[in-house]
């Protein structure tokens, strides 16, 4: 909620999901620490930069302990430094939770993904690791593999 502080947003979401008072406090502290939100914990969400807002959004999603996290264009519109910081946060989650990430940035798909799926107009055209997609298309770069899959498959 834009008029709540970072801390209040985290507490609110944890409360909605039925965590008791102590668990709300514990989970809030965990998310503040995990996403380095301590320096902005008393700032209203609407005053945060795009990068901080994305980190808060992910923390709010994770406070509920989901099995799957959907990230739709998580770094769209972020500057290079904010994007790299968010990449580090996402990287740190690998192996702890299943993530499905949509992106138009090939370098993001390359650096963050264990498997990559290429969709065209809602149709799944190819799925595989980076190496598998490059081998499938006979290309050296993901961008070239993507273009070949989109244009020829």
Where do the protein language model's features map onto the residues?
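A short, proline-enriched helix->beta-strand linker immediately N-terminal to the Walker B motif
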Residues: 63-67
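Conserved ABC ATPase signature
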Residues: 3, 44-48
């Amino acid at each position: 909620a834009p008029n709540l502080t970072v801390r209040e947003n985290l507490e609110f979401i944890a409360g909605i999901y039925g965590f008791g008072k102590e668990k709300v406090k514990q989970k809030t502290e965990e998310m503040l620490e995990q996403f380095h939100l301590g320096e902005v914990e008393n700032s209203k969400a609407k005053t945060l930069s795009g990068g901080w807002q994305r980190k808060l959004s992910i923390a709010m999603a994770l406070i509920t302990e989901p099995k799957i996290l959907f990230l739709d264009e998580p770094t769209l519109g972020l500057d290079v430094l904010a994007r790299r910081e968010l990449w580090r946060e996402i990287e740190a989650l690998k192996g702890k939770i299943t993530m499905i990430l949509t992106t138009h940035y090939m370098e993001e798909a390359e650096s963050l993904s264990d498997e990559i799926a290429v969709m065209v107009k809602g149709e799944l055209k190819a799925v595989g690791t980076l190496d598998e997609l490059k081998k499938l298309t006979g290309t050296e770069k993901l961008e070239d593999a993507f273009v070949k899959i989109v244009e020829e498959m």
